[in-house]
């Protein structure tokens, strides 16, 4: 039986830090389901179809990574995809409070699904989608080192029109 984990997020956009986390999680699990959230209540840079498409392109050569979109409860999506764990990244202590609360709620909703926290590789510890969006607003050309090439192309398309 394959050990499957789900890695949820808005991924607006996916960063090299997210990619690193997926690659490292594959050392623990047989398959990672990257679950792209509809981002209820958030204004996103990219709509969900584009975010999902970019992530599929990033992992197109990795048969062990599946990309899906979802809305609703994460634990329901995890069950749907036979995941035994939720993978979450912790960049800083400030992430812990929120992630701990979410982990506790998910555990109450389905105690069979565990939450696994991974810290980023040092070179990715300061990268976030929020940072990428903030830099891109001022100078999209400066975000190329923070995101995969296909994501940079989408950012360039979006901001070179403005």
From Swiss-Prot:
It is found in: Cytoplasm. Keywords: ATP-binding, Coenzyme A biosynthesis, Cytoplasm, Magnesium, Nucleotide-binding, Nucleotidyltransferase, Transferase. Its main location: cytoplasm. ATP binds at residues 10-11, 18, 89-91, 99, 124-130. Substrate binds at residues 10, 42, 74, 88. The keyword Nucleotidyltransferase applies. One of its GO terms (cellular component) is cytoplasm. It catalyses: (R)-4'-phosphopantetheine + ATP + H(+) = 3'-dephospho-CoA + diphosphate. One of its GO terms (biological process) is coenzyme A biosynthetic process. SUPFAM superfamilies: Nucleotidylyl transferase. One of its GO terms (molecular function) is pantetheine-phosphate adenylyltransferase activity. The record marks 18 as: Transition state stabilizer. Its cofactor is Mg(2+). It comes from the Bacteria. Pathway: Cofactor biosynthesis; coenzyme A biosynthesis; CoA from (R)-pantothenate: step 4/5. The keyword ATP-binding applies. Pfam families: CTP_transf_like. Its EC number is 2.7.7.3. Belongs to the bacterial CoaD family. HAMAP family: PPAT_bact. NCBIfam families: coaD_prev_kdtB (TIGR01510), cyt_tran_rel (TIGR00125). Homohexamer. Reversibly transfers an adenylyl group from ATP to 4'-phosphopantetheine, yielding dephospho-CoA (dPCoA) and pyrophosphate. This is Phosphopantetheine adenylyltransferase. The lineage of its organism: Bacteria, Pseudomonadati, Pseudomonadota, Gammaproteobacteria, Thiotrichales.
């Amino acid at each position: 039986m394959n050990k499957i984990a789900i890695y949820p997020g808005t991924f607006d956009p996916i960063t090299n830090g997210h990619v690193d986390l997926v690659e490292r999680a594959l050392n623990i699990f047989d398959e990672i389901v990257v679950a792209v959230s509809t981002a209820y209540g958030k204004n996103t840079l990219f709509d969900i179809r584009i975010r999902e498409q970019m992530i599929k392109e990033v992992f197109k050569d990795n048969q062990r990574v599946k990309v899906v979109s979802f809305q609703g409860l994460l634990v329901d999506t995890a069950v749907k995809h036979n995941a035994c764990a939720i993978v979450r990244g912790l960049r800083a202590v400030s992430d812990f409070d929120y992630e701990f609360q979410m982990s506790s709620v998910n555990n109450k909703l389905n105690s069979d699904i565990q939450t696994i926290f991974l810290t980023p590789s040092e070179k990715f510890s300061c990268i976030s989608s929020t940072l990428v969006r903030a830099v891109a607003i001022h100078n999209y050309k400066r975000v190329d080192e923070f995101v995969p090439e296909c994501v940079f192309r989408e950012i360039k398309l979006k901001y070179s029109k403005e």
